[in-house]
Design a protein with these regions (language model features):
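Acidic helix N-cap motif at the loop->helix transition within catalytic regions
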Residues: 24, 49-57
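Active-site acidic Asp-centered loop
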Residues: 45, 92-94
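A conserved acidic beta->alpha catalytic loop
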Residues: 29, 44-52, 69
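Short loop->beta transition adjacent to catalytic acidic/histidine clusters or analogous donor-positioning motifs
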Residues: 8-10, 31-42, 62-63
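N-proximal low-complexity "stem/linker" segments adjacent to membrane-targeting elements
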Residues: 1-32
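Short aromatic/hydrophobic "clamp" motif used to bind/position activated sugar donors
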Residues: 89
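Glycine-rich, basic loop-to-helix element that forms the pyrophosphate-binding segment
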Residues: 67-84
């Protein structure tokens, strides 16, 4: 069943600034989860290392929100929460 066809229960929101490898490890771990009723939102806090473009290419199912300035962890969480579709919000700090 496609993700759009089922009700999303959990929105996983990950504010991100540079450090591609930690983000990739986090995303790989989430994709290996047996629980599948969730969406992933990555909020890019003005990364300068081009990491978000690599993530966009390799994880097409992830929602990416790009901020032109670094909003910090709390600001990134708030920005991600605006687009979240889940009944519950789960915030990760990579």
């Amino acid at each position: 069943m496609a993700q759009e066809e089922r009700s999303i229960i959990v929105s996983v929101i990950i504010p991100h600034h540079n450090n591609k490898q930690i983000l990739v490890d986090c995303l790989d771990s989430l994709h290996q989860s047996t629980y599948k009723n969730f969406e992933i939102i990555v909020v890019d806090n003005a990364s300068s290392d081009n990491s978000i473009n690599d993530v966009r290419s390799n994880y097409p199912d992830i929602t990416i929100i790009q901020s032109l300035k670094n909003l910090g962890y709390a600001g990134g969480c708030n920005l991600g929460a605006i687009d979240a579709k889940g009944e519950y919000l789960f915030f990760l700090n990579n």
